[in-house]
């Protein structure tokens, strides 16, 4: 088999390079919200913090987690209680599921020639979320920062993955949407990198990914 491929989760396996916060804001606006991006972002970051502290978070699947985060976020926004929470969650989750269904054959194809892994800054329930999307069985290694106790771009978290695969950094690829956590972090330890981002998104200063794609469906050609 050829070298392992590591993937980020949010924004990578469930969307074409668009982070959760940005997609949450779009869903909020579609459900009737009117707060400016800066006000929403402050509330979203606080809801992230509260979600991570919630008892029982490790057992939540994707739908339950998203619904809970929206419950936490609504009172933090100026008009949050007036927003249709069900429509907000349904739109967000529906788009994720469509992307996951599209990406599943790509991942299954890669498993024929490479071991795959996920390395994500998450909340302790990465496995249930991957399972709900039907993606868990594609991965040999699943590293959740809340479980491991390390967060990207910490080199030690990447090293946990390399050790699990019994491969060197130079033999591995990292695919992700975050310039700092995924691409710069992996490159710093010697891993090849593939940045997943919309075509219109400018390359951040100083970022030098080995490859760039706009959809995970483009990845097999990059790796060949």
Show where each model-derived region lies.
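N-terminal helical cap/lid subdomain that shapes the substrate entry/recognition surface
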Residues: 2-105, 127
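Asp-based, Mg2+/Mn2+-dependent phosphohydrolase catalytic module
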Residues: 1-3, 7, 38, 80-83, ...
């Amino acid at each position: 088999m050829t070298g392992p491929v590591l993937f980020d989760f949010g924004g990578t396996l469930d969307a074409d390079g668009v982070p959760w916060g940005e997609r949450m804001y779009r869903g909020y606006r579609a459900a009737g919200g009117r707060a400016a991006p800066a006000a929403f972002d402050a509330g979203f970051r606080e809801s992230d913090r509260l979600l991570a502290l919630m008892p029982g978070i490790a057992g939540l699947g994707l739908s339950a987690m998203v619904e809970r985060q929206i419950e936490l976020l609504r009172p933090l926004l100026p008009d949050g209680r007036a927003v249709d929470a069900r429509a907000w969650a349904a739109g967000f989750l529906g788009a994720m599921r469509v992307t996951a269904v599209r990406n599943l054959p790509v991942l299954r194809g890669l498993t024929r020639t490479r071991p795959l892994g996920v390395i994500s800054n998450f909340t302790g329930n990465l496995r249930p979320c991957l399972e709900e999307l039907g993606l868990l069985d594609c991965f040999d290694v699943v590293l959740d920062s809340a479980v491991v106790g390390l967060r990207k771009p910490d080199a030690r978290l990447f090293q946990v993955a390399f050790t699990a695969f019994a491969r060197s950094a130079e033999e591995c690829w990292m695919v992700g949407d975050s310039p700092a956590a995924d691409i710069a972090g992996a490159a710093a330890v010697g891993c090849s990198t593939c940045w997943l981002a919309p075509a219109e998104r400018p390359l951040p200063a100083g970022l030098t990914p080995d490859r760039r794609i706009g959809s995970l469906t483009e990845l097999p050609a990059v790796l060949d």
